[in-house]
Amino acid sequence: MGFSDNLNHMEKRKSGYVTQKQFSEFKDANNQRLIKIETTLATQGEQLNQLIKVVILQGEQIKELQVEQKAQGEQIKAKGEQIKAQSEQIKTQGETLKLILQALGGINKRLDKVDPPK
């Protein structure tokens, strides 16, 4: 066995020389880290897809609510117009009743003049 067998095949690295075994362990550790990162990214990707689906669903629900609110707004506006028309009608009826009362008052005065109380 030679000198290089004894050192387990040396590799030149930035930090100095390392054995093939150390280099393999380093590569394995890095590969495990990469696998963890890939797994985490895949999980986060799935979570993101689920969140996107939820957001899309909520967007559709919001659109439906907006349509519903618009319809309710139109109904409220129509009811307001009805109330306004009824108010005008009541006001007109009130004026008519005033005129009727005035006429009745005039009739009453004339009746009092024609038939004095006994």
Curated annotation (Swiss-Prot):
Belongs to the UPF0134 family. This is UPF0134 protein MPN_287.
